[in-house]
């Protein structure tokens, strides 16, 4: 009880002194119709996905129909989709066993998405892969380069027409 008493008498008083003035006004909400009518895709409803080193996998308690890459020889998953927006949901973990994927859209590398994150705890994270004003047909490739043993979990995709 001495610890708790000390906390309430000393620590909370110090916190009150160090907080300063806090602006309690919230910013105006931002609304965009751009992401309305987003569609969900996973291995249960996506067709035409070329898998090389990836395999269908129950990736997470809330995402049962994803894909897993596990190995060191490299691999990819590739598909074609008509969309204006594409998001990838992947699993983050604070572990060197989780790797980074290079994302290619229409043959050009657009980003690398690392699933080894200091704040990862097997949680889903979203990465924007395409964010265009107009819908168009795109070829998307998620590529794992050869190297150290690594794992990468793609849980699902979201897209807007």
Sequence positions of predicted segments:
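Glycan-recognition surfaces in beta-rich domains, encompassing non-catalytic CBMs
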Residues: 3-161
